[in-house]
Structure formats: structure tokens, C-alpha cells
């Protein structure tokens, strides 16, 4: 599992590559939380386009980050165009509460739109 983070407009961008499972989810969670909380980010975009596998631990990881971001009055968005991962997200019910976008650029534009309109 590979994790890359960057900051853009007060949003933490988290790019995950490889397999997100019970072996990797705890260390990934700690890295994401330390970066998000330690740098006073408001929003988060999780880019899952390069994930090759995700189990229920990955769903739990995303759900926990969603709660954290919402508690800080931020927005969490997911970027994913991988059909297998999208199906997992849909079956878990996450897509009922978290918006999904096909590209990082579109997700970042949506955050700017929300920020500019206060919604």
C-alpha cells in the first residue's frame, strides 16, 4: 500500500495506491489523521483511482475520516473511476453520504464551489 498526500486550498488530498486491507488500514489511518489534524485542514479528497483492492477495513477507514472531517465542518469527497472499487463503495452505503467524482480536478472544483457558496 502506498500513500501520498498533498495540500491544495486548505484541503488534504490523499492518494492511495495498491491494496487497502486490514494489514494496511491502521497505519494508513494514522498517517492520514496526523496530516489532517496536524495541519489544520478543513476538507479532504480521497483519490482511490489507483487502488487495486479494498476490503471492509478500507470502508471503515473512509467512514472514520468522513466523521472526522464532518466534525470539523468540512467536506470529504472520493475520486474513483475503478468499477470494482465503486461497486464496493456503493454496496457499503458510503455513496449515500459521500459524493463520488471521476477525477481529482472535478472534485477540487466542487470543493471550491461549496466554499464559494457556503454549502
How would you name each of these model-derived features?
Residues 5, 14, 63, 96-97, ...:
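Generic detector of low-complexity/intrinsically disordered segments
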Residues 84, 103-106:
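Residue-level recognition of oxygen-bearing side chains
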Residues 105-119:
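A charged, well-structured terminal subsegment
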Amino acid at each position: 500500500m502506498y500513500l501520498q498526500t498533498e495540500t491544495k486550498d486548505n484541503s488534504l488530498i490523499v492518494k492511495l495506491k495498491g491494496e487497502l486491507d486490514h494489514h494496511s488500514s491502521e497505519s494508513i489511518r494514522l498517517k492520514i489523521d496526523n496530516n489532517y489534524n496536524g495541519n489544520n485542514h478543513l476538507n479532504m479528497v480521497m483519490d482511490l483511482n489507483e487502488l487495486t483492492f479494498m476490503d471492509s477495513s478500507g470502508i471503515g477507514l473512509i467512514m472514520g475520516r468522513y466523521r472526522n472531517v464532518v466534525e470539523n465542518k468540512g467536506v470529504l469527497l472520493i475520486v474513483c473511476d475503478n468499477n470494482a472499487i465503486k461497486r464496493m463503495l456503493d454496496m457499503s452505503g458510503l455513496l449515500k453520504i459521500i459524493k463520488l467524482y471521476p477525477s481529482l480536478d472535478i472534485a477540487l472544483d466542487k470543493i471550491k464551489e461549496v466554499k464559494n457558496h457556503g454549502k
